[in-house]
Each structure stands twice: as C-alpha cells, then as structure tokens.
Amino acid sequence: MCTTISFAEPEIVLGHGRRVLFVNPDDLQIFKEIELPPDLGLKCHETQSQESCPATATSTTAGKEPGGKEQQLAKQPEEGGTSASGSVATSTSVQNVAYSPDGQLLAVTTSGGQKALLLYRSRPENARLLSARPLARAASAVRFCSDSSSVLVTDKTGDCYQYDCVEVEAPPRLLLGHLSVVYDILWSEDQQHIITCDRDDKIRVTNYPATFDIHSYCLGHREFVSGLALLTEQHIASASGDKTLRVWNYIQGKELLQHELPAPAVRLLVRQLEPEKVFQAAVLFYEHVDALGLYRLERSSDDTWSVTATQLVCAEAGSWSISNFTLTSDRIYITGAENERLSLRVYDIATGQPTTNGVPEGWLKMVLDGLGANEEGAPPFIPEDLSVWFKKRFDNVTDYLERKKRRIEEQKQQKC
C-alpha cells in the first residue's frame, strides 16, 4: 500500500488506501475528500488494444512494443472476487495523486485489484469524477502538461502514455518507452520536451510531439535517478541513489553542478525562493540518521550553480519507516509507518524540529480517521521496500580466480 502527500497551493493533498483528503494548510482542517468507488467500472474503447485495457485482456501475450519488449498480461479479477488461481483479489488503493497546473483537475492512479487513471474536476465544487480509464500496469509517475490539457502516466515497465484531459474518455497514446522502471517525469513549460529518469541511471530528454526523436541525455549518475525538478526553461535538478544532487542544462545534456549527499536519495522536491535564481531542494534519504536534507541552490549571472546552505532534518529517523513528505512555506509534513500503522508528523522548516505551533490538538487523529487508517480491520501499512531500486551486482571473477589459483597449486604438487 502506498501513501502520497503533496502541496498544491492552497491545499495539502493526502492519499492512502481508498481515500484522498484535501487539507487547508492554514488551519489544518479537512475541507474536501474523495473515496474510491467500490467498482471503477473500467471499460475498453474499441480502439484500445488489450495492452492498454487490462480489465478485459484474456490472452497472455499482447504482442511486442517498439524495441521488441514482449508484454505479458493476465486477466484482472473483479475487486473482492477471485483470481484464476483461486486467491482473493487485492483491494484497489490510491497510488499517485497529481494536481493540474490550473488547479482544476486532479489525476489519481490506483493499484491492486483495479489499475486505473481517475480524472476528477476538483474545483470550484466538490471533487467530481470525470473518467476512469484502465492502466495496463501500476503507474510509477504522473505529470500534467503546462496547459492542463493532458496528463502523462509512466508505468513500472518503462512505458509512458499520454491521456487527454479534454476528451476525457479518449484512449491513451503511447509516447515513449524505457527498458526499466521510470521513477519521475517532467514536461517542459513550452511542451517541447518530455524529461524522464529511470532505474538504469539515465535522464532522457525526448522531443514532443515527435517522441521518436531523442533530443539529449543527461548522463553521469551511477545509480537509479529517483527524482527530477524543473528549475528554469533550460535547467533541471536530479537526485540519485549514487548519493548526489545534480543540476543540468537539459537542452545541452550538460552537467552544471554535482553535490555530494550523505546517503542515497529516494525523493526530491524543489521550491522556488527567487524566480529562476534561488531554489530550495529537499531530498529524502534512504536509511540514514538524518531523514531529510534541505539545500539552497543559487544560480549566478554566468549560469553557474552552487549549494550555498545545507540543513539536515533528523525527523526521528530510525524510530519509524518514513515513506513520503511535502513542503509548505513554513512546515515539513512527513508520512511513514509506526508499528505498521500510518503516521504523519509535522516539522518546522526553519529549525527542522517537531512543531505544534498552529497545529490543532487532535489534528493527527482527525486526518488518520479521515484516511481510514484507524478503522478496525484496516490492513497494516508497510512502506515500499526501496532496496530493490539498487542495482544487484554479482562478483563471479573472485571465485574464478580462487579456483584457478587452487588448480595451479594442485598441478604443481602433482609434478613434485
């Protein structure tokens, strides 16, 4: 089960289980919520292939994609029903939540029993479901374009689909594909480039709409690239499992800054402090005594970048399993698991210390109740095992050399 949390002015959005809550960051009151319907009613368009409509796929092989990757699909059981093997179907739950730039639309992807992209009209009225479109596989990242007319969804096999937000029932369009899971995706403000990062250390810049044409690569990371953030029209920031935070000119594919981190980075958020000049990058670390690092990025007149200030936030790391976080102008909100139960904690962004200033008494219980985390029979919350993100390295050379050494010694003894 996943927990997602984000800040989209003027509200904090939390998703967990089957619910999404909208919280006012000023008084921390819940003013709107979404609960997934029991049956998403997923239907295929006639123009959709089985690959993009798992809800009705019955064959095991749906052909090959460009690049020769074979697709293996299995029929999706009804929620609460039984699969072909006789096991009970997994409950559908919220996986990713993204707000459109104009603040009018909300994209929610689900995982488990029914994998889908749900599009909601979120303002000005209460959230209203516009469409539910099936996903072939669980989504790994979601991003709207700058004019909110479409949304990109990447999945865990590396494929990226474009979904129309005007014709909300239109079938998706396959734009591009990676050979490994895509962890984050950006769409440039001018909508000329789509920027993706994956488990294979790569940052790829693809031209749009001619997505068959790769514009550039930003190469240099030695482990998975977990997060991307758009800084200016030509610059992005990236964080990686190789313990580095980097800034790139993505148009040229040129690295402009490499800053060493104390631990592998698994999440990246960036806030703009001064337009196109000063930014605050927040990095979530993997298994480190400090949970978060806050870095002040500054751009000079000659287009060089530097980290001018660093703040490490402990966030009681080690006492609970941290899964996600978001930032507002004065607070850090962190979600995680404590004794296999969802927990949410608030920290002051200036000091990095836990804060109760402006936090109403009983607020945490109210939010957890709203997400259904305290309900009797609620499933345990176990955050994703991020150790699988790292490359598995096998050393068979040492064993070979040891065997060769023993064989040479045995031959010498026989000659004697």
UniProtKB/Swiss-Prot annotation:
Species source reads: Drosophila erecta (Fruit fly)
Q: Region Disordered: what ranges?
A: 47-88
Q: In which tissues is it expressed?
A: In testis, it is present at high level in hub cells, a niche for germline stem cells of testis. Ubiquitously expressed in all testicular cells throughout spermatogenesis. Ubiquitously expressed in all germline and somatic cells of the ovary.
Q: Which UniProt keywords apply?
A: Cytoplasm, Developmental protein, Differentiation, Nucleus, Oogenesis, Repeat, Spermatogenesis, tRNA processing, WD repeat
Ranges annotated as biased composition (Polar residues)? 49-62
Q: What else is known?
A: Wuho means 'no progeny' in Chinese.
The keyword Repeat appears for this protein: yes
GO biological processes: oogenesis; spermatogenesis; tRNA (guanine-N7)-methylation
Purpose of the protein: Required for the Mettl1-dependent formation of N(7)-methylguanine at position 46 (m7G46) in tRNA. In the Mettl1-wuho methyltransferase complex, it is required to stabilize and induce conformational changes of the catalytic subunit. Required for binding of nanos mRNA and repression of translation by the mei-P26-bgcn-bam-sxl complex. May cooperate with mei-P26 and nanos to derepress the BMP signaling pathway. May cooperate with mei-P26 to suppress expression of a subset of microRNAs. May cooperate with mei-P26 to regulate bam expression levels in germline cells during gametogenesis.
Question: Pathway, according to UniProt?
Answer: tRNA modification; N(7)-methylguanine-tRNA biosynthesis
PROSITE patterns cross-referenced by the UniProt entry? WD_REPEATS_2, WD_REPEATS_REGION
WD repeat locations: 89-130, 177-216, 220-258, 317-357
Which superkingdom does the taxonomy of this entry point to?
Eukaryota
Tell me where it resides: Nucleus; Cytoplasm
What family, per the record?
Belongs to the WD repeat TRM82 family.
**Protein name per its UniProtKB record:** tRNA (guanine-N(7)-)-methyltransferase non-catalytic subunit wuho
Entry's Gene Ontology cellular component terms: cytosol; female germ cell nucleus; male germ cell nucleus; nucleus; tRNA (m7G46) methyltransferase complex
Q: How does it assemble?
A: Forms a heterodimer with the catalytic subunit Mettl1. Interacts with mei-P26 and weakly interacts with bgcn; required for the function or formation of the mei-P26-bgcn-bam-sxl complex. Interacts with nanos; may be involved in mei-P26-dependent derepression of the BMP signaling pathway. Interacts with Myc; the interaction may be mediated by mei-P26 and may be involved in the regulation of ribosome biogenesis.
